[in-house]
């Protein structure tokens, strides 16, 4: 899988309603690709999808909190794991299939792209890769 940054034009389109999110997204993308240089990415209409080759993480403007509770700017990170995360940082969690949990985490600053978050990203990467 190629290690390429998401196309600026496609990102501008994705984040057109909240362009202040782009630096936050770029910081997350950089950390993720530094940790997993073999990860692929696709900029889609509503999200950026990270693959290995299965999807293990997404970045989007999904409203995982009430609008009044969202930071400005914000980015929602979605991770697929084999268990439910027990953390106040998780805004929403669901089990769409037995043994597969989808977690949505809203971040509002680069400081929130920390060791804890990137440990969960790594766990999601390994979970998707080893399926």
Residues of each region from the PLM?
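Conserved short hydrophobic patches within well-ordered secondary structure
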Residues: 1, 77-79, 121
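Alpha-helical interaction segments
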Residues: 15, 40-41, 91, 110, ...
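Short, conserved beta-strand/beta-arch hydrophobic-aromatic motifs that form part
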Residues: 42-102
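Well-ordered alpha/beta subsegment
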Residues: 96-131
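Residue-level marker of positions within ordered structural domains that often coincide
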Residues: 37, 82, 129
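Charge-rich, low-complexity N-terminal segments
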Residues: 1-31, 36-43, 47
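Amphipathic alpha-helical interface surfaces
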Residues: 24, 28, 55, 117-120
């Amino acid at each position: 899988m190629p290690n390429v940054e998401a196309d600026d034009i496609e990102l501008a389109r994705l984040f057109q309603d909240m362009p202040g999110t782009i630096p936050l997204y770029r910081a997350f993308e950089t950390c993720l690709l530094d940790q997993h240089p073999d990860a692929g990415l696709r900029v889609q209409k509503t999200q950026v999808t990270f693959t290995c080759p299965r999807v293990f993480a997404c970045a989007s403007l999904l409203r995982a909190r009430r609008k009044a509770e969202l930071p400005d700017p914000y980015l929602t990170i979605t991770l697929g794991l084999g268990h439910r995360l027990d953390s106040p940082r998780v805004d929403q969690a669901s089990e769409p299939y037995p043994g597969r949990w989808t977690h949505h985490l809203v971040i509002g600053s680069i400081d929130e792209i920390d060791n804890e978050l990137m440990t969960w990203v790594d766990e999601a990467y390994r979970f998707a890769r080893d399926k």
